[in-house]
């Protein structure tokens, strides 16, 4: 794994390796021992779009491993505003850092960046396309809170059209056995056909008994996992279309308090989960956010080890 751009670039072996390494990183965090795994290394965080959890958890992960962080969170203060191209920015950063984490509004921008980089690049989200480190912490949450990833029934609710976390997680789940998925969304935000086609293809390839269905109604009977998403206002080309679907779904105590399941959400939350749900034992979205640190520690460690002998050609 030279870069980490899409969950589609890795297989089940690599996924399990990251999960195993994340367990070790969580143990390290709980032990409060100091790590120097990334001592002397610099992580550059290039965030062309806003971020709270992803950026801060990557920065925390790097510092917990003994490394340091440089970067930007607002392109208004960078040479991008002067017309600097992405390839030029990447070439420059290659001379400053050992790894790059980047978020960009354009689908495919991190993959383009890889063509101009001699150091590992991690995709922290590109448009409505991919968010692979979020996928890994989602899988890690399921494994830690349920005990296994195989043999689960999961409901995805909300913005399934623009929700890159949903797209990535569906692909990752396709490597596991006996997964049943229920897509719950308004017709305007239904899961893209390319995602369901991918599930069909994986089912034929691995014969791992993946099932899925689509509906507009919330019925959580028999679910192991509920994965809520916000309606992503910033992705709508027409604001009037957003107004039609905003507030379509709101998860309440009545939906879940008598059910044996876990509730996940990639955050930020707007109004799709009532705050009264927060105190229920089923609510795991803040724990899910915490798991981002050991998972991203694992990703940084693996990429650093894989690329430690690769020297910059600049």
Curated annotation (Swiss-Prot):
Reactions listed under catalytic activity: carbamoyl phosphate + L-aspartate = N-carbamoyl-L-aspartate + phosphate + H(+)
One Pfam entry name: OTCace
Binding site for L-aspartate: 82, 164, 230
GO molecular function, one term: aspartate carbamoyltransferase activity
Keywords assigned by UniProt, alphabetized: Pyrimidine biosynthesis, Transferase
Enzyme Commission number: 2.1.3.2
Pathway the protein takes part in: Pyrimidine metabolism; UMP biosynthesis via de novo pathway; (S)-dihydroorotate from bicarbonate: step 2/3
GO annotation terms (biological process): 'de novo' pyrimidine nucleobase biosynthetic process; 'de novo' UMP biosynthetic process; amino acid metabolic process
Binding site for carbamoyl phosphate: 53-54, 103, 131, 134, 267-268
InterPro entries reported in the protein's UniProt record: Asp/Orn_carbamoyltranf_P-bd (IPR006132), Asp/Orn_carbamoylTrfase (IPR006130), Asp/Orn_carbamoylTrfase_sf (IPR036901), Asp_carbamoyltransf (IPR002082), Asp_carbamoyltransf_Asp/Orn-bd (IPR006131)
EC class of the enzyme, as a word: transferase
SUPFAM superfamilies: Aspartate/ornithine carbamoyltransferase
Family under the similarity heading: Belongs to the aspartate/ornithine carbamoyltransferase superfamily. ATCase family.
Task performed by this protein: Catalyzes the condensation of carbamoyl phosphate and aspartate to form carbamoyl aspartate and inorganic phosphate, the committed step in the de novo pyrimidine nucleotide biosynthesis pathway.
Quaternary structure, from the entry: Heterooligomer of catalytic and regulatory chains.
Name the record gives this protein: Aspartate carbamoyltransferase catalytic subunit
Species of provenance: Methanococcus aeolicus (strain ATCC BAA-1280 / DSM 17508 / OCM 812 / Nankai-3)
């Amino acid at each position: 794994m030279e870069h980490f751009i899409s969950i589609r670039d890795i297989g089940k072996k690599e996924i399990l390796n990251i999960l195993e390494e994340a367990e070790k990183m969580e143990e390290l965090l709980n032990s409060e021992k100091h790590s120097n795994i990334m001592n002397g290394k610099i992580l550059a965080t290039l965030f062309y779009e806003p971020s709270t959890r992803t950026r801060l958890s990557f920065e925390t992960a790097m510092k917990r491993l003994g490394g340091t962080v440089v970067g930007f969170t607002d392109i208004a203060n960078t040479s991008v505003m002067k017309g600097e191209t992405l390839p030029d920015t990447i070439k420059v950063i290659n001379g400053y850092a050992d790894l790059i984490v980047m978020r960009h509004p354009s689908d495919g921008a991190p993959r383009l960046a890889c063509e101009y980089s001699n150091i590992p690049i991690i995709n922290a989200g590109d448009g409505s396309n991919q968010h692979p480190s979020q996928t890994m912490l989602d899988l890690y949450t399921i494994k830690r809170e349920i005990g296994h990833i195989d043999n689960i029934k999961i409901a995805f609710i909300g913005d399934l059209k623009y929700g890159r976390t949903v797209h990535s997680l569906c692909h990752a789940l396709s490597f596991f056995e006996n997964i049943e998925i229920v897509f719950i969304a308004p017709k305007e935000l239904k899961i893209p056909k390319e995602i369901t086609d991918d599930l069909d293809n994986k089912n034929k390839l691995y014969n791992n008994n993946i099932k899925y269905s689509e509906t507009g109604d919330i019925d959580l009977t028999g679910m192991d996992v509920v994965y809520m998403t916000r309606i992503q206002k910033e992705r709508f080309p027409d604001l009037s279309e957003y107004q039609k679907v905003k507030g379509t779904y709101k998860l309440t105590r009545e939906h879940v308090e008598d059910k044996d399941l876990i509730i996940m959400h990639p955050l930020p939350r707007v109004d799709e989960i009532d705050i009264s749900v927060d105190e229920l034992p089923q609510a795991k979205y803040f724990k899910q956010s915490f798991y981002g640190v050991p998972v991203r520690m694992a990703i940084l460690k693996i990429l650093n080890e894989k690329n430690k002998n690769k020297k910059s050609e600049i």
